[in-house]
Amino acid sequence: MADINSPLEIGVTTGPIRGSKKIYVGARTGSGVRVAMREIQLEGGEEPVRVYDTSGPYTDPEVSIDIQAGLPALRREWIMGRGDVEEYAARAVKPEDNGQLGPDRSGGVPAFPNVARTVLRAKPGQNVSQMHYARKGIITPEMEYVAERENVGRAKLETAPDGQAWGAEIPQEITPEFVRDEVARGRAIIPNNINHPETEPMAIGRNFLVKINANIGNSAVASDVAAEVDKMVWSIRWGADTVMDLSTGRNIHDTREWIIRNSPVPIGTVPIYQALEKVGGIAEDLTWDIFRDTLIEQAEQGVDYFTIHAGVRLPYVPMTAKRVTGIVSRGGSIMAKWCLAHHKESFLYERFDEITEIMKAYDIAYSLGDGLRPGSIADANDEAQFAELYTLGELTKRAWEQDVQVMIEGPGHVPMHKIKENMDKQLEACGEAPFYTLGPLVTDIAPGYDHITSGIGAAQIGWYGTAMLCYVTPKEHLGLPDRDDVKVGVVTYKLAAHAADLAKGHPAAKVRDDALSKARFEFRWRDQFNLSLDPDTAEQYHDQTLPAEGAKTAHFCSMCGPKFCSMKITQEVRDFAAKQNSDSYLASENIKRETSAEEAEEAREGMSDMAELYKAKGERLYLPESEAD
């Protein structure tokens, strides 16, 4: 049994991602804002490739990482400089905050040692949301940071974007003014609680790069704060743009504090989970006062967005009765049970405007939960799902009336032919507020492979306009993901998000693809590894069959071998054509001098002779060495 006052040993992965270095780019506005990026170093005189980076200070060897102290408060001066916040004494931590209904805190985890004694909130009559600033015409440092971050790679563009954007309005260049306008219109959010100054600002919206979220958190059967902090750092190393702490069971408050203080990305939660723990897991005992207290507790800690299942209304619950899988959302089922037990409208719906007042005092974004999402393809696009969606649209407009940022959560389990309807209806119902979907899974027959079944749907709905994709790991429906599962889920969803960016014609999306393709053709193996989403696995697979160091410079791989490598043969064809300097049109590069008539005729005769030889040898593409002369 852990001693609540004992030190906590937490080890996280630090150091540069292989083949890369952390760089900081100054905003072009000259404001002094410095934006973190990753630069992949290439061989053969090739210019390095810059990529969007979510890993925070953990990949900067110049930064000393101390998990006990937390990360530097990057945004503190920006927040205080606006003059619209006040400091006050933080709410005292109660035993029930950690799922302990009595005074005994044994079995808990050590409290974070560097907890702030005072926290921030808006001054009376003030609104500190990024949407409020945007609507007042103010470009904040957060907006400048986002603009510079989203422009990565665009300076090297040589070709026009190629894709189908489905109505998205993606500019050739992202400016701070464009970011401000998107936030003001509600088409994008910058989730940044004023009590989470450690965050590096990012935007979620369909006119920006598609983002991904990773879920972590303990459960009633597995609770280890060290493992959860490690999973957070591990997930952002591989590309998670936000992280949701879905902890249930005990130690929720303390686990969340460790995570937030060490997270450079926005942290989301589902507050109803913790509220339920405070009443011993009995949904009927939930009250507005307990829920409100939980919101303030988490707001003071610095949670950046809340999933609120306010669209699960009493009249909609009977609509799920004939479903194959009923209500599969934990938050949705909690509120449905409460509504039926009391036969009353949900207090989340009835008190929505009061929740919004709390959100704007801390700049917390709504993630309006899809508590009635389909849990099987049989239930996709049904009456209950879309009834809730249109209610979420109504609530979005109410939140916008108070300048509070909103994104909308979506399914779920949806077969491919029904996915676009989800996107179209969400845009219509919710006024283009960012869509945030869990997959969707396109089939239900692959437990153990649901990162793939959902990745297919995620790429598709991301192309249609979803702004953020919530990852699914191989453990979905089976168990709690471990560190390896987290990596697989993140990399799978980075792939889906990138595929969506390519399909939308997002400027600069192809830069990394083209660099890797060129490295592949030129047999620059290390560059291929380093440009990939997972360099370690790429090299590991290569070395399973060709482990020798010399294989890293070989002009073939184990798939085809030296004699059958199509790219090596193509290079030889190019070299031959260029050497012959003929008009055979085989050379893909421009010939630097004119071909004489005599040379052209000689080349034609030579090719005619070789064509006859090819026929004489049985029209075989490859010959044994004994017959090659």
UniProtKB/Swiss-Prot annotation:
| Cofactor note (record) | Binds 1 [4Fe-4S] cluster per subunit. The cluster is coordinated with 3 cysteines and an exchangeable S-adenosyl-L-methionine.
- One GO CC annotation, please? cytosol
Q: Which cofactor does it need?
A: [4Fe-4S] cluster
> Known catalysed reaction(s)?
5-amino-1-(5-phospho-beta-D-ribosyl)imidazole + S-adenosyl-L-methionine = 4-amino-2-methyl-5-(phosphooxymethyl)pyrimidine + CO + 5'-deoxyadenosine + formate + L-methionine + 3 H(+)
- Oligomer and partners: Homodimer.
Tell me which EC number(s) this protein carries.
4.1.99.17
Q: Which family does it belong to?
A: Belongs to the ThiC family.
Q: Which residues bind substrate?
A: 215, 244, 273, 309, 329-331, 370-373, 409, 436
Q: Which GO terms describe its molecular function?
A: 4 iron, 4 sulfur cluster binding; carbon-carbon lyase activity; zinc ion binding
Write down the species: Erythrobacter litoralis (strain HTCC2594)
User: What pathway does the UniProt record associate with this protein?
Assistant: Cofactor biosynthesis; thiamine diphosphate biosynthesis
Protein residues bound to Zn(2+): 413, 477
Q: Which InterPro entries match?
A: ThiC, ThiC-associated_dom, ThiC/Bza_core_dom, ThiC/BzaA/B
What top-tier enzyme class does this entry carry? lyase
Q: Which NCBIfam families match?
A: PRK09284.1, PRK13352.1, thiC
Function text? Catalyzes the synthesis of the hydroxymethylpyrimidine phosphate (HMP-P) moiety of thiamine from aminoimidazole ribotide (AIR) in a radical S-adenosyl-L-methionine (SAM)-dependent reaction.
The segments labelled Disordered in the record are: 589-610
Task: Write down what this protein is called.
Answer: Phosphomethylpyrimidine synthase
